[in-house]
Amino acid sequence: MTRAQHRALEVLWPKYGIGDDTSLLTAIGIFGDQRPLTLEIGFGNGQNLVDLALAHPNQGYIGVDVYRPGAGRLMLALDRLEIGNVRILLQDAAEVFLRRFTERSLDNVLIYFPDPWPKKRHHKRRILRPVFLHNLALCLKLRGFLRIATDCNHYCQTILECIALEPLLTNLDPPDQGMEPLHRRTITKYEAQGIERGHPILDILAQRA
């Protein structure tokens, strides 16, 4: 972590951070109005959130991650660009659904390039598993979207199988259906690495039934 990132976590956290208590989070509680609310899980360096927030200032965005240097970098960018519609939650994503968000409170959930844990003995560490997807689906509004991207074909197939087993989610195929510019993503470091290695970029779009 750089000195600037460390200082951002200290100085800018009251402005952009969300406390790790057990209070439920809503758009009106965070932003003071009923704006649409999008949650990005694993925001990395935060560039995707910055780009979305700048393009759509009337939307509300929350980034969830445990990587503190990335949070510090994101807060520096938010402060420099005077962005007011992004908040950061430093918490394990597996703990936020139903603990921090109520049912039918989120318009969109974005999960871009989650760790595929390619070794079979590590598959249990993957975040996108049935219980996680069920709790996530409960927190989506009716007809809300779950948007996932990965460059791991095996992980993609596993995710699709989990979605097929979840009655609250409908897989939209082809995956670009409904992918309006509001949620077209910024190419992340991990996506760029996948492209450089010749991996296909696989998009999944599911909707709350």
Which residue ranges define each predicted feature?
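Conserved beta-strand/loop positions that form the S-adenosyl-L-methionine
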Residues: L39-I41, V64
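Conserved SAM/SAH-binding beta-strand->alpha-helix loop
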Residues: Y67
